[in-house]
């Protein structure tokens, strides 16, 4: 089954979503992705971003976009790890799988009543941070979370970490989109419409079950 998702569809919920719904959406997106992949969704940030963006767009009628680029991961106690593909790799890669180090997440721009434009950021992969730390041989003492959901202007690098070598190249940013990476991510999305459509449908069914069971 293919699900075609556009931002003009009649919304089911208002965006930005109430914070009380965040863990519910996180759970159904994770279950959908993990059931369709291996290792509980580990190393599948692209799938989380694409399925999550399509699902949120379907729910709200607002355009949520999967984006890809670099990330500085915070493992706690000042242990930071940089995920970033080299410029040469970004220029020569013809498929997302050819990017050695990258991260994917979701963004949406919202215009508030006072005219302010803010960027909402959603990342359903924080549940795997401790596993990443173990894989690269670094200790993990950070906060155990399953997702990040908020605003870019509220998710800033603390002053005490801004001089860390991890931020030397891109400045004090936890995540930064890269055009080439995002283009490859969107190509991957177009390449497998039925695959992602099934996961979005699964997430919608899981959400309906949640509402029915707890309504």
Label the predicted regions:
Residues 1-215:
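A structural boundary/capping signal
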């Amino acid at each position: 089954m293919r699900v075609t998702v556009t931002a003009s569809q009649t919304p089911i919920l208002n965006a930005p979503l109430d914070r009380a719904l965040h863990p519910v959406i996180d759970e159904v997106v994770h279950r959908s992705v993990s059931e369709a992949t291996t290792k509980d969704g580990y190393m599948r940030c692209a799938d989380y971003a694409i399925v999550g963006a399509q699902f949120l767009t379907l729910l709200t009628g607002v355009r949520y976009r999967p984006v890809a680029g670099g990330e500085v991961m915070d493992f706690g106690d000042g242990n930071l790890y940089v995920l970033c593909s080299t410029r040469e790799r970004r220029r020569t890669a013809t498929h997302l799988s050819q990017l050695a180090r990258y991260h994917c997440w979701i963004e949406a721009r919202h215009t508030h009543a006072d005219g302010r434009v803010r960027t909402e950021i959603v990342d359903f992969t924080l549940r795997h941070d401790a596993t990443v730390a173990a894989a690269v041989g670094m200790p993990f003492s950070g906060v155990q979370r399953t997702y990040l959901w908020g605003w870019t202007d509220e998710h800033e690098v603390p002053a005490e970490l801004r001089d860390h070598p991890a931020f030397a190249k891109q400045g004090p940013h936890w995540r930064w989109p890269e055009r080439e990476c995002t283009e490859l991510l969107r190509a991957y999305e177009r390449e497998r419409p039925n695959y992602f459509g099934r996961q979005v449908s699964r997430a919608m069914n899981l959400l309906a079950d949640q509402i029915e069971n707890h309504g």
